[in-house]
Protein backbone atom coordinates (compact mmCIF):
# COMPACT_ATOMS: atom_id res chain seq x y z
CA UNK A 1 0.00 0.00 0.00
CA UNK A 2 1.19 3.48 -0.88
CA UNK A 3 -0.04 6.51 1.03
CA UNK A 4 0.71 9.57 -1.06
CA UNK A 5 -1.93 12.12 -0.06
CA UNK A 6 0.54 14.89 -0.80
CA UNK A 7 0.43 13.75 -4.43
CA UNK A 8 -3.31 13.20 -4.32
CA UNK A 9 -3.59 9.42 -4.15
CA UNK A 10 -3.62 6.30 -2.01
CA UNK A 11 -2.86 2.99 -3.74
CA UNK A 12 -4.44 -0.11 -2.21
CA UNK A 13 -2.41 -3.27 -2.82
CA UNK A 14 -4.89 -5.94 -3.89
CA UNK A 15 -3.40 -9.44 -4.11
CA UNK A 16 -2.11 -10.96 -7.36
CA UNK A 17 -2.60 -7.72 -9.26
CA UNK A 18 0.86 -6.27 -9.87
CA UNK A 19 0.87 -4.32 -6.62
CA UNK A 20 4.53 -5.04 -5.81
CA UNK A 21 5.64 -3.60 -9.15
CA UNK A 22 3.54 -0.47 -8.66
CA UNK A 23 4.80 -0.01 -5.10
CA UNK A 24 8.43 -0.39 -6.16
CA UNK A 25 8.03 2.14 -8.96
CA UNK A 26 6.19 4.82 -7.00
CA UNK A 27 7.44 4.35 -3.44
CA UNK A 28 9.81 7.32 -3.67
CA UNK A 29 6.80 9.58 -4.29
CA UNK A 30 4.86 8.33 -1.24
CA UNK A 31 4.71 9.67 2.29
CA UNK A 32 4.11 6.19 3.75
CA UNK A 33 4.67 2.67 2.40
CA UNK A 34 3.09 -0.41 3.97
CA UNK A 35 4.81 -3.52 2.57
CA UNK A 36 5.23 -6.08 5.36
CA UNK A 37 3.74 -8.29 6.63
CA UNK A 38 1.27 -9.22 3.85
CA UNK A 39 -1.72 -8.64 6.15
CA UNK A 40 -0.69 -4.98 6.42
CA UNK A 41 0.45 -4.57 2.81
CA UNK A 42 -2.88 -5.90 1.55
CA UNK A 43 -5.08 -3.91 3.94
CA UNK A 44 -8.62 -3.84 2.57
CA UNK A 45 -10.43 -0.64 1.68
CA UNK A 46 -12.63 -1.00 4.77
CA UNK A 47 -9.48 -1.43 6.86
CA UNK A 48 -8.03 1.71 5.32
CA UNK A 49 -11.21 3.63 6.10
CA UNK A 50 -11.22 2.46 9.69
CA UNK A 51 -7.58 2.95 10.61
CA UNK A 52 -5.63 5.01 8.07
CA UNK A 53 -8.19 7.47 6.75
CA UNK A 54 -8.66 9.04 10.23
CA UNK A 55 -4.87 9.21 10.62
CA UNK A 56 -4.46 11.04 7.31
CA UNK A 57 -7.30 13.36 8.24
CA UNK A 58 -5.55 14.21 11.52
CA UNK A 59 -2.43 15.13 9.54
CA UNK A 60 -4.24 17.59 7.31
CA UNK A 61 -5.33 15.29 4.49
CA UNK A 62 -9.14 14.98 4.50
CA UNK A 63 -10.64 12.21 2.36
CA UNK A 64 -11.67 14.59 -0.42
CA UNK A 65 -8.05 15.74 -0.87
CA UNK A 66 -6.88 12.46 -2.45
CA UNK A 67 -8.19 9.59 -4.55
CA UNK A 68 -8.09 5.95 -3.48
CA UNK A 69 -7.21 3.61 -6.35
CA UNK A 70 -6.54 -0.09 -6.84
CA UNK A 71 -6.30 -2.86 -9.43
CA UNK A 72 -8.89 -5.56 -10.06
CA UNK A 73 -8.03 -8.72 -11.99
CA UNK A 74 -10.35 -10.92 -14.04
CA UNK A 75 -11.62 -13.26 -11.28
CA UNK A 76 -10.72 -16.67 -12.72
CA UNK A 77 -7.35 -15.35 -13.87
CA UNK A 78 -6.81 -13.98 -10.34
CA UNK A 79 -7.61 -17.36 -8.80
CA UNK A 80 -5.33 -19.21 -11.22
CA UNK A 81 -2.51 -16.85 -10.27
CA UNK A 82 -2.89 -17.90 -6.63
CA UNK A 83 -2.86 -21.56 -7.68
CA UNK A 84 0.31 -21.03 -9.70
CA UNK A 85 1.96 -18.91 -7.01
CA UNK A 86 1.41 -21.59 -4.39
CA UNK A 87 2.91 -24.25 -6.65
CA UNK A 88 6.38 -22.70 -6.46
CA UNK A 89 9.19 -25.08 -5.59
CA UNK A 90 9.95 -23.49 -2.23
CA UNK A 91 6.60 -24.62 -0.80
CA UNK A 92 7.16 -28.23 -1.94
CA UNK A 93 9.62 -28.70 0.93
CA UNK A 94 7.75 -30.35 3.85
CA UNK A 95 9.89 -28.36 6.30
CA UNK A 96 8.74 -25.04 4.88
CA UNK A 97 6.38 -23.32 7.37
CA UNK A 98 3.91 -22.66 4.53
CA UNK A 99 4.07 -26.15 3.02
CA UNK A 100 0.37 -26.70 3.74
CA UNK A 101 -0.36 -24.06 1.08
CA UNK A 102 1.49 -26.03 -1.61
CA UNK A 103 -0.58 -26.63 -4.77
CA UNK A 104 2.01 -28.34 -6.96
CA UNK A 105 0.13 -31.65 -6.79
CA UNK A 106 -3.34 -30.13 -7.12
CA UNK A 107 -5.09 -29.42 -10.42
CA UNK A 108 -6.63 -26.03 -10.94
CA UNK A 109 -10.09 -27.56 -10.98
CA UNK A 110 -9.43 -29.19 -7.60
CA UNK A 111 -8.13 -25.86 -6.33
CA UNK A 112 -11.17 -23.99 -7.67
CA UNK A 113 -13.62 -26.40 -6.06
CA UNK A 114 -11.76 -26.28 -2.75
CA UNK A 115 -11.84 -22.49 -2.97
CA UNK A 116 -15.60 -22.41 -3.49
CA UNK A 117 -16.15 -24.92 -0.68
CA UNK A 118 -13.71 -23.23 1.69
CA UNK A 119 -12.55 -26.69 2.65
CA UNK A 120 -8.76 -26.58 2.29
CA UNK A 121 -6.06 -24.34 3.73
CA UNK A 122 -4.22 -24.18 0.40
CA UNK A 123 -7.26 -22.57 -1.27
CA UNK A 124 -8.03 -19.90 1.32
CA UNK A 125 -7.05 -16.73 -0.50
CA UNK A 126 -9.89 -14.30 0.23
CA UNK A 127 -12.28 -12.57 -2.17
CA UNK A 128 -11.50 -9.56 -4.37
CA UNK A 129 -15.01 -8.14 -3.91
CA UNK A 130 -14.47 -7.94 -0.16
CA UNK A 131 -11.14 -6.18 -0.66
CA UNK A 132 -12.80 -3.16 -2.29
CA UNK A 133 -15.98 -3.12 -0.18
CA UNK A 134 -16.35 0.15 1.76
CA UNK A 135 -17.49 0.47 5.34
CA UNK A 136 -21.22 1.02 5.76
CA UNK A 137 -22.27 4.50 4.71
CA UNK A 138 -18.83 5.53 3.43
CA UNK A 139 -17.65 6.35 -0.09
CA UNK A 140 -16.44 3.68 -2.50
CA UNK A 141 -12.96 3.31 -4.00
CA UNK A 142 -12.54 6.24 -6.39
CA UNK A 143 -10.89 4.41 -9.28
CA UNK A 144 -10.60 0.67 -9.92
CA UNK A 145 -8.35 -0.27 -12.85
CA UNK A 146 -8.37 -3.57 -14.70
CA UNK A 147 -5.22 -5.63 -14.28
CA UNK A 148 -4.90 -6.08 -18.04
CA UNK A 149 -4.83 -2.27 -18.42
CA UNK A 150 -2.17 -1.43 -15.87
CA UNK A 151 -0.91 1.11 -18.38
CA UNK A 152 -3.92 3.29 -17.53
CA UNK A 153 -3.11 3.13 -13.82
CA UNK A 154 0.53 3.97 -14.51
CA UNK A 155 -0.50 6.95 -16.65
CA UNK A 156 -2.80 8.13 -13.84
CA UNK A 157 -0.09 7.84 -11.19
CA UNK A 158 2.53 9.48 -13.41
CA UNK A 159 0.20 12.42 -13.86
CA UNK A 160 -0.24 12.61 -10.09
CA UNK A 161 3.50 12.60 -9.36
CA UNK A 162 4.32 14.88 -12.29
CA UNK A 163 6.88 12.71 -14.06
CA UNK A 164 7.29 9.57 -16.14
CA UNK A 165 7.94 6.47 -14.02
CA UNK A 166 9.07 3.12 -15.40
CA UNK A 167 7.32 0.08 -13.93
CA UNK A 168 9.01 -3.32 -13.97
CA UNK A 169 7.72 -6.74 -12.92
CA UNK A 170 8.04 -8.44 -9.54
CA UNK A 171 6.65 -11.31 -7.48
CA UNK A 172 5.42 -13.19 -10.56
CA UNK A 173 3.80 -16.63 -10.37
CA UNK A 174 5.34 -19.71 -12.06
CA UNK A 175 4.12 -20.60 -15.55
CA UNK A 176 1.62 -23.44 -15.38
CA UNK A 177 -1.19 -24.33 -17.77
CA UNK A 178 -4.58 -25.45 -16.51
CA UNK A 179 -7.89 -26.89 -17.61
CA UNK A 180 -11.37 -26.26 -16.24
CA UNK A 181 -14.38 -28.37 -17.12
CA UNK A 182 -17.31 -26.39 -18.49
CA UNK A 183 -19.34 -27.35 -15.41
CA UNK A 184 -16.69 -26.09 -12.99
CA UNK A 185 -16.15 -22.89 -14.95
CA UNK A 186 -19.89 -22.17 -14.89
CA UNK A 187 -20.03 -22.75 -11.13
CA UNK A 188 -16.97 -20.57 -10.60
CA UNK A 189 -18.40 -17.72 -12.66
CA UNK A 190 -21.62 -17.89 -10.64
CA UNK A 191 -19.61 -17.93 -7.41
CA UNK A 192 -17.65 -14.90 -8.62
CA UNK A 193 -20.76 -12.94 -9.64
CA UNK A 194 -19.97 -10.05 -7.23
CA UNK A 195 -16.42 -9.92 -8.58
CA UNK A 196 -17.52 -9.88 -12.21
CA UNK A 197 -19.88 -6.98 -11.53
CA UNK A 198 -16.94 -4.97 -10.22
CA UNK A 199 -14.64 -6.11 -13.01
CA UNK A 200 -17.11 -5.10 -15.72
CA UNK A 201 -17.25 -1.57 -14.29
CA UNK A 202 -13.48 -1.23 -13.81
CA UNK A 203 -11.48 1.28 -15.84
CA UNK A 204 -10.08 -0.25 -19.01
CA UNK A 205 -13.06 -2.38 -19.98
Per-region residue spans from a language model:
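Membrane-interface amphipathic segments in extracytoplasmic regions
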Residues: 1-205
Amino acid sequence: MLLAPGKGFVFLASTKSGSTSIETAFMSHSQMILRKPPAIKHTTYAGFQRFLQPFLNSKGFPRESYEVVCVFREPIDWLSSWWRYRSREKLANPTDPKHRNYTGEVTFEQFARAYMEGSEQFAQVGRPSRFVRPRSGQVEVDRIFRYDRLDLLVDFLCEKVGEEVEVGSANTSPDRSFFLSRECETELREFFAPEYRIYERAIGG
